[in-house]
């Protein structure tokens, strides 16, 4: 589903330095029960609309909106409605540490633009889900210069699933 909430903290908090934003990112929407019905409605509509499309192999909960009760409920609904497909949500890592979060309905651990060392830390540590890059190698300028490093890492670790290159296009100004 196209649930995206880049920076709602700007509207809610006077102290918007990065540490404060990161620590409280999930409070305004993702971990706010008042948004459960809205998030669930959007997820339901997407899944019901696209359930018969053969190209859909993974349900994504959205992009960069943090994690909390709204997405826990949405994931539970998705799994009850369509258990045949995998689920992922890149923003599941963005929580506030104030409670124990439910990740049981997530099948994949997904990230955007991690370093190779960050990936290795998850895989060699306590990571309990296959690792997938839901966005990497943004093709802007010389951004994709790390493709070979990622490919070698994918090939040498059985619990990686590869990834999805974000925007395989050139954003340079045409002259």
How should these model regions be labeled?
Residues 1-175:
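Substrate-binding/catalytic cleft of secreted carbohydrate-active enzymes
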């Amino acid at each position: 589903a196209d649930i995206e909430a880049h920076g709602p903290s700007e509207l809610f908090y006077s102290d918007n330095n990065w540490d404060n934003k990161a620590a409280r990112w999930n409070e305004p929407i993702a971990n706010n029960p008042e948004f459960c019905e809205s998030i669930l409605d959007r997820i339901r509509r997407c899944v019901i609309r696209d359930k018969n499309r053969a190209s859909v192999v993974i349900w994504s909960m959205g992009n960069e909106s943090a994690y909390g009760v709204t997405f826990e409920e949405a994931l539970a609904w998705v799994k009850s409605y369509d258990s045949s497909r995998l689920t992922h949500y890149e923003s599941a890592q963005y929580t506030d540490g104030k409670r124990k979060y439910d990740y049981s309905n997530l099948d994949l651990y997904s990230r955007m633009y991690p370093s190779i060392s960050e990936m290795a830390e998850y895989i060699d540590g306590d990571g309990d889900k296959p690792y997938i890059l839901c966005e990497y190698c943004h093709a802007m300028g010389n951004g994709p210069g790390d493709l070979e490093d990622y490919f070698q890492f994918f090939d040498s670790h059985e619990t990686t699933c590869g990834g999805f290159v974000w925007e395989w296009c050139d954003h340079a100004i045409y002259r």
